[in-house]
A protein has these predicted regions:
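Cytosolic juxtamembrane N-terminal segment immediately preceding the first transmembrane helix
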Residues: 1-47, 51, 60, 536-539
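Transmembrane-helix exit segments and adjacent C-terminal regions of multi-pass membrane proteins
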Residues: 1-12, 22, 209, 453-543
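Transmembrane core module of solute transporters
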Residues: 36-38, 46-57, 63, 70-75, ...
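C-terminal module of multi-pass small-molecule transporters
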Residues: 41, 82, 93-100, 120-121, ...
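Residue-level signature of mid-helix packing/kink "hotspots" within the transmembrane helices
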Residues: 49, 76-84, 134, 167-168, ...
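Interfacial helix-cap and linker-helix signal at transmembrane-aqueous boundaries
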Residues: 58-59, 89-90, 112-113, 122, ...
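Helix-loop-helix hairpins in multi-pass membrane proteins, especially solute transporters
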Residues: 83-231
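Hydrophobic transmembrane-helix bundles of small-molecule transporters
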Residues: 182-303
Length: 543
């Protein structure tokens, strides 16, 4: 029997033993670990929400507003790129080492953001802090592994509650620190985030002390390196990064026919095609292990989580943007409004945990969740001018879900940016001219009026021939209409994807047989389990 097969038999034996002993309650060690994991998720969401909600405050201080799309984009890209490599490395070198090292990067990156004086430095800070998001699949995996399977809905629900709390507190504190045009308050926000990252890192170091995993103990370093899917990583990186770069650049500042956009887009697409061919025809047990797709639930769940990732990042980046443009309220009010969604998330996470534990079913809450997402997107898309103010296998499952959620987020942000930029550039001129020309404004002055309104340049407005308060008011109405139409394209695109995901949810099969007392990876050996092992001969123990 090979070493790898022996390891797999050993892990299955551990699962059988934990099933025998699976009636025990959740231990204090497991509770402390779950609290630590929840703290990591809390600060990650606070970091991600801040990257979207405080974008305009950061740009107002350091400049480079055209680069601001990369604040959230770099986090989404790194989450997708690092999720599977980090998860596979954790199986080989141990969960704790990878989790602690990656989480500590969030502390360093947050300090860089807080001290930044240019947009490039801010992007670098988000890149470093984005490394911490590579541990996101581990957070879901660990919280599921250390408790009995019948308690998994509660463990996963606690993570969603922590995510909602991180978003709510982040939005409200970020709003307080930056309200009344105090844009420099973003620095204090990321100092706070850095402090929470530090506490979370120390907590994981102290409270997570799992026994060595089978592959961690048996394989040598060269063997561990060979077990990683290096070719797959090599295809995924340019496919995702270049594809997102091309969409981010389209219309901001290059046209689709420009070499910057066209070359990166083609290389990204070709790399993506190469990745698909390699993972389907050549590498059977790489990032996308073929046995994962034997059950239709997995493929359907990937599609749903991809759409959910796009929906989250759409709301995270464009809700505050649209409200600030159309309604002109301060950051605290915007944060309080958006926090309503996360309050609903926390409540629904608890209710879903109760429902799934009692019914042992998942399909209904998934369909219901996408129904509410569609409703949210449609409501945002139908905002009208009358509202505006002119002033192992389970581990492989988990890591793949997080990869596809992050892929949805990174690709979604790039797609949304392309839709919004092209929509705004194509509607800005016609909407403003349609509003001011009937009032007698000279057509030859439109070339000066449109950029002056778009950049809120009051000095340039005063120098335009034929300008008047009535013309300015009408021009602002046209400007807001152009923004509204551009936002509508983003929301409707996301709503369409959520509709497809909700339909896919009807075909999911409820895995009622999976809700058992089995604990896949206890964080410490149990003496009673050892005694059971002595009395019971389990296949694979002698391997």
């Amino acid at each position: 029997m090979s070493e790898r097969s022996s390891c797999e038999h050993g892990e299955r034996a551990n699962e059988v033993r934990s099933e025998v002993h699976g009636n025990s309650k959740v231990s204090m060690k497991s509770l402390l670990l779950l609290l630590s994991i929840n703290l990591v998720y809390f600060v990650q969401v606070a970091n991600a929400v801040g990257s979207g909600a405080l974008t305009r405050d950061i740009s107002a201080v350091v400049g480079g507003s055209h680069d601001s799309v990369w604040y959230s984009e770099v986090i989404a890209i790194l989450t997708a790129l690092l999720g599977i490599p980090a998860s596979q490395a954790a199986d080989l070198w141990g969960r704790k080492t990878i989790l602690v090292c990656l989480t500590s990067c969030g502390f360093v990156g947050s300090l860089i953001i807080a001290k930044a004086s240019s947009s490039g430095t801010v992007i670098a800070g988000f890149a470093v802090s984005g490394i911490s998001f590579g541990a996101q699949p581990l957070l879901h995996a660990i919280s599921s592994e250390v408790v009995a399977r019948k308690y998994r809905p509660w463990a996963q629900g606690s993570i969603n509650v922590s995510a909602s709390l991180g978003a709510i507190i982040g939005l409200l504190i970020g709003g307080v620190l930056t309200r009344h045009e105090h844009h420099d308050g973003f620095r204090a926000y990321w100092y706070m985030v850095a402090g929470i990252y530090a506490v979370a890192t120390v907590a994981c170091q102290f409270f997570y002390n799992p026994p060595p995993r089978a592959l961690e103990s048996v394989l040598s370093v060269p063997e561990k390196m060979r077990n990683l899917d290096w070719v797959g990583y090599g295809f995924l990186t340019p496919a995702l990064v270049l594809f997102c770069m091309s969409l981010a650049w389209s219309g901001n500042p290059y046209s689709w026919t420009d070499a910057h956009v066209l070359a990166t887009f083609l290389i990204g697409v070709l790399s993506g095609v190469a990745l698909i061919v390699y993972e389907t025809s050549i590498k059977k047990n790489g990032m996308f292990h073929h046995r994962l797709f034997r059950d239709r639930n997995f493929a359907l769940a990937l599609g749903c989580i991809f759409a959910e990732g796009m929906a989250f990042h759409c709301g995270n980046n464009y809700f505050a943007f649209e409200v600030s443009v159309l309604f002109a309220t301060d950051n605290l009010i915007i944060g309080a409004q958006y926090s309503m969604a996360f309050i609903a998330l926390g409540i629904s996470a608890i209710m879903s945990g109760i429902w799934c534990s009692i019914s042992k079913a998942l399909r209904f809450p998934i369909i219901l969740a996408f129904g509410f997402k569609i409703l949210f997107m449609v409501l945002m898309a139908t905002v009208s001018n009358s509202f505006c103010n002119t002033s192992r296998i389970d581990r492989d499952y988990i890591r793949s879900y997080d990869l596809y959620r992050s892929l949805g987020g990174s690709i979604g942000l790039a797609v949304f940016n392309a839709i919004f930029s092209n929509g705004l550039s194509s509607n800005l001129g016609p909407k403003i001219s349609h509003a001011v020309l009937p009032l007698g404004f000279p057509e030859r002055e439109l070339l000066q009026l449109i950029p002056a309104l778009a950049h809120n340049d009051t000095v340039a407005l005063k120098q335009i021939h034929g300008i008047s308060p009535e013309i300015i008011h009408a021009g602002v109405d046209g400007l807001l209409e152009a923004y509204r139409v551009s936002f509508r394209g983003v929301w409707l695109t996301t709503a369409s994807l959520c509709l497809v995901a909700s339909i896919a949810g009807f075909f999911l099969r409820d895995p009622t047989e999976k809700f058992t007392s089995q604990i896949d990876a206890p964080i410490a050996p149990d003496t009673e389990v050892v005694e059971i092992k002595k009395r019971t001969k389990i296949p694979g123990d002698s391997a």
